[in-house]
From Swiss-Prot:
It comes from Arabidopsis thaliana (Mouse-ear cress). One of its GO terms (biological process) is transmembrane transport. InterPro entries: AAA+_ATPase, ABC_transporter-like_ATP-bd, ABC_transporter-like_CS, ABC_transpr_CbiO/EcfA_su, Molybdenum_import_ModC, P-loop_NTPase. This is ABC transporter I family member 10. One of its GO terms (cellular component) is chloroplast envelope. ATP binds at residues 77-84. The keyword Cell inner membrane does not apply. Keywords: ATP-binding, Nucleotide-binding, Transport. Belongs to the ABC transporter superfamily. ABCI family. PROSITE patterns: ABC_TRANSPORTER_1, ABC_TRANSPORTER_2.
């Protein structure tokens, strides 16, 4: 996993919520659904910010793509291309300036830095944390959900472990289990392997891939990454540059496209 780092990693970002609900902006909108068998879809999505001088700076420009249900997709592109902003909009943390968005619910955001999300003293308590809002759920059902979620990410035997004894990759898997315990349909994953060692990187990727395969269409994952070698685990990908979706489709096609761009760039430097 140390191989080809496609783009430089960005620093960690902190968001305040684990489970996120969509909101609606005055211009952009969140749709109930565009079509069947689609978990995520954007149409002509734009997002801009204003400077102190009142100048509008575009961050996302006319982005359109769709992700089928039950698949693992990745978003790749250079630093500053809009990957994380796009993920925040899909999560409902940021409203689009214009365009339309559909993300199947429930959806959950898993942070780049697990220490921003995994905060309870034990594994069991942390995975159960998000279930506290379901006041009609008894303790037996809570425990059953926690066990099933931990089994899905290969962490069942860690249920009583203190959080501080876990590695970074294990904490990421606990964060994913917390999302699964809430029966989420879409996982939004922000550069989960950026600060992990090789063993932890593989553990997290395998957990997500195994989860998607085991759920058989019930869970979809969208993973922001800067590592080209991670793309081989995906079903499809979105490649971005300068706030635009340049290509989207099956993982092999996007991988070939990126490698061709890299080769062309190297040839230009050498000429």
């Amino acid at each position: 996993m140390n191989g080809h780092c496609l783009f430089a990693a960005s620093p960690p970002r902190l968001f305040p919520l684990r489970s996120i609900s969509s909101s609606v902006s005055p211009s952009g909108s969140y749709r109930i659904k565009f079509s069947d068998n689609v978990a995520v879809e954007c149409r002509n999505l734009c997002f801009s910010v204003s400077t102190r001088q009142g100048i509008s700076v575009p961050i996302l420009r006319d982005c359109s793509f769709r992700i089928p249900s039950g698949q693992l997709w990745m978003i790749l592109g250079p630093n500053g291309c809009g990957k994380s902003t796009l993920l925040k909009i899909l999560a409902g943390v940021v409203n689009p300036s214009s365009g339309t968005v559909f993300v199947e619910k429930p959806k959950n955001f898993v942070f780049q830095n697990p220490d921003h999300q995994v905060v309870m003293p034990t594994v069991e308590a942390d995975v159960a944390f998000g279930l506290g809002k379901y006041h009609d759920m008894n303790q037996e059902e809570v425990k059953s959900r926690v066990i099933k979620a931990l089994e899905a990410v290969g962490m069942r035997d860690y249920m009583q472990r203190p959080i501080q004894t876990l590695s970074g990759g294990q904490k990421q898997r606990i964060a994913i289990a917390g999302a699964l315990a809430e029966a989420c349909k879409v996982l939004l994953l922000d550069e989960l392997t950026t600060f992990l060692d090789e063993s932890d990187q593989m553990g997290v990727i395998k957990a997500v891939k195994d989860l998607i395969n085991a759920k058989k269409g019930d869970v979809t994952a969208l993973w922001v990454t800067h590592r080209l070698e991670e793309l081989k685990y995906a079903d499809g990908a979105v490649y971005m540059e300068n706030g635009r979706v340049v290509r989207h489709g099956d993982a092999a096609t996007i991988s070939d496209f990126i490698k061709a761009k890299q080769s062309s760039y190297i040839d230009q430097i050498g000429s």
